[in-house]
């Protein structure tokens, strides 16, 4: 299902790009029609979903159309809340050929090149600077966790940001390129819970908050305000909360300074290099991790043939970083 949503989002973005509208001004009726067309085309590309020959297939198709319409609505509201402009969609690493951030020189004169795809890249530009926001669409409820980054389990978004920044430095050599944020958007249909009946407006606000992306945002006020210009207290668009004195609540926000983004990036580069060296050395040890809620075996497609018992003590505990 995740692939269908990804394809539909790419098609919707292209349709909007080729129209007379953009994310900031597209009328609701046009947005809904474009979204429906994009999803219908995406479904048609998957034979198992293309023909509604059963009631189950017909229901699933109808539900996917509804979730996708809601997804495009929420993404549009998130864009309109700020000044970041969606610029690029489904950018493959092949399009970033020659970027040093994607190539690692290993021992024995071996070069390792990374493969991947950036779902969406937004920019906020002024006379001297360009800030970048990287969005990764997820059909599962992925949360950004610095502990997982430290353990080498969640390196993807940091790599995407590094590659995007290098690309823009080459395109705009006279401007400062800054990390704005790395965010996961969960494609979902959340159930709203409330002790009292909600008005239509309250339900809409609650839905936006439930669909708020998760990730890491630059703590610079000019940057996070460019993602959500008018919020007070908790933002409905980014994982940031402001205290009454106007300062960021670090306990309730996921933020990092530009300098801290750079430190995280250097650490991720080190981890990737270490992984590359281990792969080249032939290290294929069965050494999965374990956290409080899952192990690396939980969603592994090879679990049926691996033979690893999740109860074995070999599983490394995923604990707080020192």
Residue ranges of each PLM-predicted region?
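Structural signature of nuclease core domains in nucleic-acid processing machines
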Residues: 1-322
């Amino acid at each position: 299902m995740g692939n269908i949503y990804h394809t539909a989002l790419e098609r919707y973005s292209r349709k909007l790009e080729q129209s007379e509208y953009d994310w900031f001004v597209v009328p609701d009726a046009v947005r809904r029609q474009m979204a429906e067309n994009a999803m219908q085309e995406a479904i048609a590309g998957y034979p198992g979903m293309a023909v509604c020959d059963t009631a189950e297939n017909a229901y699933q198709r109808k539900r996917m159309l509804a979730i996708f319409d809601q997804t495009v609505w929420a993404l549009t509201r998130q864009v309109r809340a700020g000044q970041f402009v969606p610029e690029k969609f489904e950018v493959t690493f092949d399009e970033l050929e020659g970027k040093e951030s994607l190539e690692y020189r290993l021992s024995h004169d071996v070069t390792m090149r990374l493969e991947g795809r950036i779902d969406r890249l937004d920019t906020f530009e002024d006379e001297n600077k360009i800030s970048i926001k990287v969005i990764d669409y997820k059909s599962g409820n992925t949360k950004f966790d610095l502990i997982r980054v430290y353990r080498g389990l969640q390196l993807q978004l940091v790599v995407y940001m590094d590659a995007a920044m290098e690309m823009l430095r080459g395109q705009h050599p006279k401007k400062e390129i800054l990390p704005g944020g790395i965010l996961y958007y969960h494609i979902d249909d959340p159930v709203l819970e409330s002790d009292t009946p909600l008005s239509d407006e309250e339900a809409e606000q609650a839905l936006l908050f439930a669909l708020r992306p998760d990730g890491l945002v630059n703590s610079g006020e000019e940057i996070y305000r460019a993602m959500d210009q008018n919020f007070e207290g908790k933002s409905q668009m980014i994982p940031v909360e402001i205290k009454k004195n106007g300062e960021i609540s670090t306990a309730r926000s996921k933020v990092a300074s530009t300098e801290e983004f750079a430190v995280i990036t250097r650490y991720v580069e080190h981890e990737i290099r270490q992984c590359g060296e281990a792969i080249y050395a032939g290290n294929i040890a069965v050494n999965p991790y374990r956290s409080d809620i899952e192990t690396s075996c939980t969603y592994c497609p090879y679990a049926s043939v691996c033979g690893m018992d999740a109860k074995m003590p070999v599983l490394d505990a995923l604990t707080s970083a020192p």
